[in-house]
């Protein structure tokens, strides 16, 4: 490694965040409201909407935090989105949404080792992350690159029920895109079925 990375970690904060994440991800918290869940992160959330304040997130690392927001859904290990962060022809901030925690860990490792400061990684089901944390008409572009095809289980009437691109999620994606034809949804797949 030719580049050194300076990370400051506040261990009590990390411990609290990991504990909160475990509670949320394993379903132990059933009666708390979204606002109660987000209390440890108040400076990064809008008090009126409970949506993430991406300007605040990105301004912690960069002088110009007002670049457009672009999102990749189902980012896997993060290769594509990290390459975009480095080489995008126009400056942008990126949000990566991934369901699997092992892949999220790989993305965060690549961010830290690569000095990436225009990427925010979110773990969770894409529709829930977009609905709960991303404001309406706030996203320049949503990318879905080569998603896993929907799997139909025996007895399922709706084969798209567990897929990230089910109708409900497509509606949420549409609401998150900039208005007046400025928002784009780019879907790339090699699956013909």
What are these regions (language model features)?
Residues 1-71, 79-87:
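S-adenosyl-L-methionine
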Residues 131-141, 146:
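A short acidic, Gly/Pro-enriched loop at the edge of an enzyme's catalytic core
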Residues 164-181:
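A short glycine-rich, Lys/Arg-flanked "PGG" loop and its adjoining helix->strand segment in the class I
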Residues 181-189:
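Conserved beta-strand signature within the Rossmann-like core of class I S-adenosyl-L-methionine
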Residues 152-164:
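Glycine/threonine-rich flexible loop motifs
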Residues 102-105, 160-161, 185:
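Conserved nucleotide-cofactor-binding alpha/beta core module
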Residues 68-128:
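SAM cofactor-binding core of SAM-dependent methyltransferases
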Residues 154-156, 188-193:
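Conserved class I S-adenosyl-L-methionine
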């Amino acid at each position: 490694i030719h580049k050194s990375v300076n990370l400051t970690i506040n261990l009590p904060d990390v411990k609290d965040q990991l504990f909160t994440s475990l509670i949320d991800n394993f379903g132990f918290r059933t009666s708390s409201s979204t606002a109660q869940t987000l209390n440890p992160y108040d400076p990064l959330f809008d008090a009126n909407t409970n949506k993430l304040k991406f300007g605040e997130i990105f301004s912690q690392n960069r002088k110009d935090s007002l670049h457009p927001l672009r999102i990749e859904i189902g980012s896997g290990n993060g290769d594509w989105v990290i390459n975009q962060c480095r080489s995008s022809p126009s400056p942008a901030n990126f949000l990566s949404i991934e369901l699997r925690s092992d892949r999220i860990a790989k993305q965060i490792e690549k961010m830290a080792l690569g000095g990436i400061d225009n990427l925010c990684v979110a773990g969770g089901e894409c529709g829930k992350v977009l609905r709960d944390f991303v404001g309406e008409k706030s996203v320049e572009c949503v990318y879905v690159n080569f998603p896993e095809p929907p799997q139909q289980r025996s007895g399922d009437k709706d084969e798209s029920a567990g897929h990230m691109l089910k109708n409900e999620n497509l509606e949420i994606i549409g609401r998150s895109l900039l208005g007046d034809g400025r928002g784009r949804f780019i879907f790339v797949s090699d699956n013909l079925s």
